[in-house]
A protein has these predicted regions:
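Membrane-anchoring hydrophobic helices of lipid-metabolizing enzymes
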Residues: 1-83, 87-91, 103-108, 112-115, ...
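Short, highly charged C-terminal tails/helix-capping segments
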Residues: 10, 244-270
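Generic beta-sheet signal
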Residues: 57-63, 142-149, 178
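Cofactor-binding loop segments of dinucleotide-utilizing enzymes, especially the Rossmann-like FAD-
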Residues: 64, 97, 150, 183-185
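Short internal beta-strands
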Residues: 92-99
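Hydrophobic/aromatic beta-strand patches that form the interior of the parallel beta-sheet core
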Residues: 95, 117, 179-183
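A cross-family acyltransferase "interaction/gating" segment
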Residues: 105-108, 143-144, 155-225, 255
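A conditional alpha-helix N-cap/helix-loop micro-motif detector
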Residues: 124-129, 161-162
Length: 273
């Protein structure tokens, strides 16, 4: 990566660090306005904090992708407001698709201040290579990077195990002493992909530290194999999510049946009135 690009990254990092005192409270206010909630929020934050404390080096944070604000929601779920301000370096850099925000100057500014490196998906390979080079440079300097290995929002509403991107595989291959954190997060009302989650949605999140199996392949094959391992892990976490959701639903149905059995159903009339 050339010197000019490095300087621009450091300038962006400095400006973002200065603006976090305003940006972080604004984002947290948005979660209140949209009434978004995360199950076991304290435990999720405790778990992520503990993992970051165990490994002080770079992290690649890999998550499923269903809405255009997933990065924001993941940041809210894993870092408290205080951690946003006091632990700015631990906040991951994000890779949003440029065409999703480039036509709105407010979104452009917010993305710049929120540690975002725009990606031109489907654009020239040289341009994509420069973006990936920036991420590798950041990781080698102890920063964290958040990436959606699927390469875009899943149109089926499930982890895309076929058309995924190989970019995350390059990070695993090229950056030593780098840990991978897989996060599966989904709202109860999220049946497919969307621009933003439904108002008042409640999210479930799982965190797993994943160590990809070493492979003998090199070049693009190595990138693909590493990326496939991460995608498969996210798919397993997705199955766990739906299994837990079915269990919750069965528990609710059982509770309702017990209420009705003991005469507590709301639809029944009280014979003592």
């Amino acid at each position: 990566m050339d010197t000019k690009s490095k300087v621009f990254l450091h300038v962006q990092d400095f400006i973002g660090r200065s603006a976090i005192f305003f940006i972080a409270p604004f984002y947290f206010l948005l979660t209140r306005i949209f009434f978004y909630r995360v199950r076991d929020l304290r435990e999720i934050r405790r778990q992520s904090t503990a993992e970051f404390a165990k490994h002080k080096g770079p992290w690649i944070i890999c998550a499923n992708h269903l809405t255009m604000v997933d990065s924001f929601l993941l940041g809210y779920a894993t870092f408290s407001l205080r951690q946003h301000i006091t632990g700015y370096k631990r906040l991951p850099w994000n890779l949003p698709e440029r065409r999703n925000f480039q036509s709105n100057i407010i979104l452009v500014v917010l993305c710049y201040l929120s540690k975002c490196i725009p990606v031109d998906r489907g654009g020239p390979r040289e341009k994509l290579k420069k973006t990936l080079d920036k991420c590798v440079y950041l990781l080698r300097n102890g920063h964290h990077v958040m990436i959606f290995p699927e390469g875009g929002r899943s149109r089926s509403g499930r982890v895309n195990k076929e058309g995924f991107s190989y970019g995350v595989g390059r990070f695993v291959r090229d950056v030593e002493n780098c840990k991978v954190m897989c996060i599966y997060m989904r709202g109860d009302k999220q049946h497919s992909y969307s621009v933003i989650p439904s108002w008042g949605d409640k999210f479930s999140a799982q965190i797993e530290v994943f160590t990809p199996e070493p492979i003998a392949e090199t070049g693009l094959r190595a990138q693909r194999e590493y990326a496939a391992q991460i995608i498969n892990r996210l798919a397993q976490m997705e199955e766990n999510y739906f299994a837990l959701r079915r269990e919750r639903c069965r528990g609710f149905e059982g509770f309702r049946e017990r209420e009705e059995k003991h005469g507590f159903a709301l639809s029944e009339k009280n014979s003592h009135r």
